[in-house]
Amino acid sequence: MDAKITNSNENKANPVNYSTQGFTGDPKFWSKPYFLNKMKNMKRLYGLFVLLCLMLTACNDDFLDVDPVDRYSDAVVWTDESLITSFVNNIYEGQKWGFHTVMLSSLCDESMEVWAWESQPVVMSELSPSYQGILAPNFWIITFHNITWTNLYKNIRACNIFFENAEKYALEGDVVDKLKGEVHYLRAYFYYWLLSQWGGIPLIEKSFTPSDDLLVARNTFEETVDFIVKDLDEAASILPLNGDKARATKGAAMALKARVLLYAASDLFVSQSLWASGYEHPELIGYVGGDRTERWQRAKKAAKAVMDLGIYHLYGENGGWKNREEATQNYADIFLCHNSDEDIMVQYYDYVNHNSSDFQLPRVGLFNSPNGFHGWGGNTPTGQLVDSYEMADGSKFSWDNPQQAAYPYQNRDPRFYASIMYNGSYWRQRPDDTVGSDPEGIVQTAYYQQSDGSYTPGLDTRQGPIEDWNGSYTGYYMRKFLDPSVNHQYDKQPYPWRQIRYAEVLLNYAEACIELGEDVEARKYINMIRKRAGMPDIPNSETGDVLKEHYRNERKIELAYEQHRYFDIRRWMIAPEVIKNVQGIDIRYPYGVTEPNYSIIDVQERKWNDKSYLLPIYLDEMQKNDLLIQNPLY
């Protein structure tokens, strides 16, 4: 018989919590004076207790039948539409939020985290089963907690509990059916993060109880991919085409499927012998057979299916900007609005009900704006990222070009000005206590020589007069995502994190086309993104590996700081080439001279080891489950 779905608070659970306290083990308890005194007090308390019980019984014989107000029985939860929705809402909170203190960009070649909060072991390839650094599930900063092995499986268990109770109570109805689709999406999302970090992992479809066999072996990489795709197909078949973009929709499920299939088809997962030679279980970390061309075709088809929905569009896709400033503002506005046709899946943060310390809140402006504006300057762009932005005419920037080296921040890709703060760029009016030092709000990361030969540091350097414990080592600050109208020292900006946007889908489609040799089709969609950005088309002469290299740089620029590059450099197997010492810029103005000297400097050591293509499984997980097989080279 189908369960009746209600929307009431009736029939709360009536569980009885029995708790007992034994006598203390303190020897003084049993000393005669202490014991007698305690006994006298206990007698008095007993008398008061009996009297109270008699009074309460006289007033209301049903007193003990009053329901607890803070708990619900399973039967109530799973027959109340609002409570079921609340349960699913809690699962949504398990998504990886991108705006926490340390961003995923600082674990690859996009940015550098300035606080030394144990991100260095990641970029030095020093992680081990017993040491996870900032990626540890119990690390004091929660920035990566949601993507740890422990918490991903915790959220998968919540998804499985939902499905078990949906079956147990025969839940039905439009709202519940939609929630089923959402939970299929969410379970696939959590498994996607596991797959991307560890390869094939145990696929769990039930919520374990203490009586269950908790020892589960890893599934193969291929089985894991297929499971995720199956969940996403199921989600897409249930979910509506349109709806709240902070909740899963048909388009979100289809777009995540396209991403998963693109990742799975990539070099890393067919090249085990190149980086994990001798590993006895290559099926856990990639495909061991099959048709790779067919996998690229599946990835292409999945991305094209999202495009064919016809409901997503690039923000400002027509381009035609009058000047660079218009193109720059359009790109900035993608991330400074609540909703657009480019958004496929977004994530808001509930600042009201999660009012924890600044360290734990996703305050992107406070964490990343310059220290001279009382920001923390946390995830500062690397010199390598800055140099990857093309010139406005589509040519590469190079420090070997004298004209470009003399004026490195002129005539660059409009996205550069929307993404990077550099010396001399305007940000916003400085706070009241510092505005006297700089009424114009100009970023100052240079050093100015005085008549005695000494140098005065700019307001936004780590040696400056404002918050010198924060600030950039590279000479740059992140501008992308930051609203200049917000006083980030005190206020929070309200815009969502973009989990999936349409530009990624177009890039995913173009990448699959390149791998299939369909260069004309690939250029068409890459150029759509470049047109929106105010950049010229990729020339038709670019084909094959040259086009692939250009595409990869375009993806790096368009999706900078959006949690893609960390995985891209691994799946393309270019990490050994790009994980190098972080470069910064030292800018010095000689005394009485208006044009500075620029020097490229190394500001952080980084090293690559092939074991870092995948993460190690935590030692405590290995010890709890002897069926688990560790990833290679750990």
Residue ranges and their predicted role:
Residues 1, 5, 18-80, 228, 258, ...:
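Bacterial Sec-dependent N-terminal signal peptides
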Residues 2, 19, 24, 59, ...:
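Long, intrinsically disordered, low-complexity segments
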Residues 11-14, 31, 60-125, 199-201, ...:
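An aromatic- and glycine-enriched ligand-binding surface/loop that stacks and positions planar moieties
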Residues 195-206, 269-273, 516-529:
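Short, well-structured active-site flanking segments
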